[in-house]
Amino acid sequence: MAAISRAIKQELLEDLKPEMYLPPKSTRRRAKVKTEEKVDVKTLVKSKSKKRRAAKNELEENVEFVRRFAPRRPYQWRGRQVRALPRPGIPVVFTPGQRSGVASKRSYDEVYADEDVLDQSGNMINEFAYGKRVKMLTHKNPTPSQVPITPQEPIARPGEAGLLPTVQVLAPRDSKHETMLPVTKSEGGDVKVENKGFEQITPQLGVQTVDIKVPVKRKSEVEDEILKRAKMEPFETTVKMEYSEQPQVEVFDTGVEPSSFFEVRSQARPIAVARKRRVPTVEVMEVQQSDHTAPTASAAPVANVIVGPHLSRRPSRWGPANAIYPDYVYHPSISAKKTMGPRPTGRVSRWGPANSIFPEVRLHPSMVSAVTRAAPRKSTKSRRRRRVRTRRAFVLPAGTKTGVMLPQNIRYHPSILFRRA
């Protein structure tokens, strides 16, 4: 009875108020636009534009979703180190919403490689020649308690691209570095050599271990005898440093290199000598002179020239650095004598001893008259100067093309000269 009454009520309800899902009609009335004549102001909204807007809104409301978008997951880029390391043959693609695995297998369509890529990897060529980890065949260590005592370095085979096999000596880790005494075969006994065999580490590397046992323990009596013999032997030096006679000290001027004993040079090249405080002593300097001839065994003995006693040169205030003069080579046109500047007296320089080192200069003849000459230095050492007289070259008398003779001490352009051969 209840079901019949429910059906009657539903039928009556559908007739009275049908179940239609339509947008409700707007109860708002349109605003009437009141137009006034003779008004310059435009209306705010035109009727045509209102119709167009209404049609546009209807299209936007009835939007049909053709496909379903994949859900985007947020990615935390902050603090991440992005390293793009694509191997050859991997297409760089982005699939939204799909997480890439750590070592995901590639489908065959994504692989672009040679047909013999497996053979290349086995032979370690082309792509697999450099920068690839080789396959370790074993991790066995036959000598776990040994430490290397010699370096193992690659040795190139001359003339070939291969390498020679290397040897590395290992020793027990607990062995102490004892004093090495002379060991013979009779004292040491028999040496045991044991070959551990050949072990293949990688396809191109093998290790062969050879165990060598050398017994070095001896009887205490023999060891004591060797130590006693070593202690009783007198200590002898290999090189004997003896003087046939007492060494003779030769003292020269500070900062000047001693010249040769067989030829007295006119100018000795100065060198820098470390400053030492010397005690005034009587010095003897032997000088041998020869007229540019090599000394022979049958030559007559040269008498020694003994210099009288004199006090050694008092070290200057600034040390031997003031004796260093540069070794100059001048132009042949500079033939004037050396012009000596005034020596500094008292306080040498405001800026230190470096400014007091002045070289002895030679000026051009045209500049000699303009420079006042100072008094020459008082030197106790006599200087020998070798004057080289050069013969002036013969110059033909020069004249112009018209026949006028020109003075010889004036240089003219070659285009105006006329010389007779």
UniProtKB/Swiss-Prot annotation:
Record's note on what induces expression: Expressed in the late phase of the viral replicative cycle.
Covalent S-S links between cysteines: none
Primary location recorded for the protein, binned into one broad class: virion
GO molecular function, one term: DNA binding
InterPro entries in UniProt: Adeno_V
Keywords: DNA-binding, Host nucleus, Late protein, Viral capsid assembly, Viral release from host cell, Virion
GO annotation (BP), single: viral release from host cell
Coiled coil: none
Localization: Virion; Host nucleus, Host nucleolus
Annotated Pfam families: Adeno_PV
Taxonomic superkingdom: Viruses
HAMAP family: ADV_CORE5
Note: All late proteins expressed from the major late promoter are produced by alternative splicing and alternative polyadenylation of the same gene giving rise to non-overlapping ORFs. A leader sequence is present in the N-terminus of all these mRNAs and is recognized by the viral shutoff protein to provide expression although conventional translation via ribosome scanning from the cap has been shut off in the host cell.
Job description of the protein: Associates loosely with the viral DNA to form an outer shell around the nucleoprotein-DNA complex and links it with the capsid by binding the endosome lysis protein. Dissociates from the viral genome during entry. Might be involved in nuclear capsid assembly of the viral particles through its association with NPM1/nucleophosmin.
Subunit structure: Monomer. Homodimer. Exists in equilibrium between monomers and dimers in solution. Interacts with the histone-like nucleoprotein; this interactions bridge the virus core to the capsid. Interacts with core protein X; this interactions bridge the virus core to the capsid. Interacts with the endosome lysis protein VI; this interactions bridge the virus core to the capsid. Interacts with the peripentonal hexons. Interacts with host NPM1; this interaction might play a role in virus assembly.
Stated family: Belongs to the adenoviridae core-capsid bridging protein family.
Protein name as catalogued: Core-capsid bridging protein
Lineage summary: Viruses, Varidnaviria, Bamfordvirae, Preplasmiviricota, Tectiliviricetes
